[in-house]
């Protein structure tokens, strides 16, 4: 049985694509597979311009990136008295995801899942020194991706 998690998904800079409804169930499946429960987090799909501004404001880097994670670390109880951890926000540039998918010769939906998982791992407290494949966090990211490779695999318009 699935643990309780709350995931909100929104778009900034464009209308929500038809597949956007698949994102929250995918995130919940990843959280469940990692025994993470009672998280409340948000996913924002955006443009390069939007994420570039955030990257500059919060990291001093004046260029777009594929994913940013912002921890919140708060807690609250819902009306039923269930305690939730405010994990934070995962911001994903769909333009950068598409560019990455072309550069690494993978499907766009695979790269989108990869950056979602990457953001979840950052919010769970993991980090990496660089992007070399030997990094513990990146090895775990790829194992989780392989475990969930069939989820969120259809209906994404930039799939080739």
Curated annotation (Swiss-Prot):
<dbReference type="GO" id="GO:0008270">
    <property type="term" value="F:zinc ion binding"/>
</dbReference>
<keyword id="KW-0479">Metal-binding</keyword>
<keyword id="KW-0378">Hydrolase</keyword>
<dbReference type="GO" id="GO:0004521">
    <property type="term" value="F:RNA endonuclease activity"/>
</dbReference>
<dbReference type="InterPro" id="IPR002036">
    <property type="entry name" value="YbeY"/>
</dbReference>
<dbReference type="InterPro" id="IPR023091">
    <property type="entry name" value="MetalPrtase_cat_dom_sf_prd"/>
</dbReference>
<feature type="binding site">
    <location>
        <position position="122"/>
    </location>
    <ligand>
        <name>Zn(2+)</name>
    </ligand>
</feature>
<keyword id="KW-0698">rRNA processing</keyword>
<keyword id="KW-0862">Zinc</keyword>
<keyword id="KW-0690">Ribosome biogenesis</keyword>
<dbReference type="InterPro" id="IPR020549">
    <property type="entry name" value="YbeY_CS"/>
</dbReference>
<feature type="binding site">
    <location>
        <position position="118"/>
    </location>
    <ligand>
        <name>Zn(2+)</name>
    </ligand>
</feature>
<feature type="binding site">
    <location>
        <position position="128"/>
    </location>
    <ligand>
        <name>Zn(2+)</name>
    </ligand>
</feature>
<keyword id="KW-0255">Endonuclease</keyword>
<keyword id="KW-0963">Cytoplasm</keyword>
<protein>
    <recommendedName>
        <fullName>Endoribonuclease YbeY</fullName>
        <ecNumber>3.1.-.-</ecNumber>
    </recommendedName>
</protein>
<comment type="function">
    <text>Single strand-specific metallo-endoribonuclease involved in late-stage 70S ribosome quality control and in maturation of the 3' terminus of the 16S rRNA.</text>
</comment>
<dbReference type="GO" id="GO:0005737">
    <property type="term" value="C:cytoplasm"/>
</dbReference>
<dbReference type="GO" id="GO:0006364">
    <property type="term" value="P:rRNA processing"/>
</dbReference>
<dbReference type="GO" id="GO:0004222">
    <property type="term" value="F:metalloendopeptidase activity"/>
</dbReference>
<dbReference type="Pfam" id="PF02130">
    <property type="entry name" value="YbeY"/>
</dbReference>
<comment type="similarity">
    <text>Belongs to the endoribonuclease YbeY family.</text>
</comment>
<keyword id="KW-0540">Nuclease</keyword>
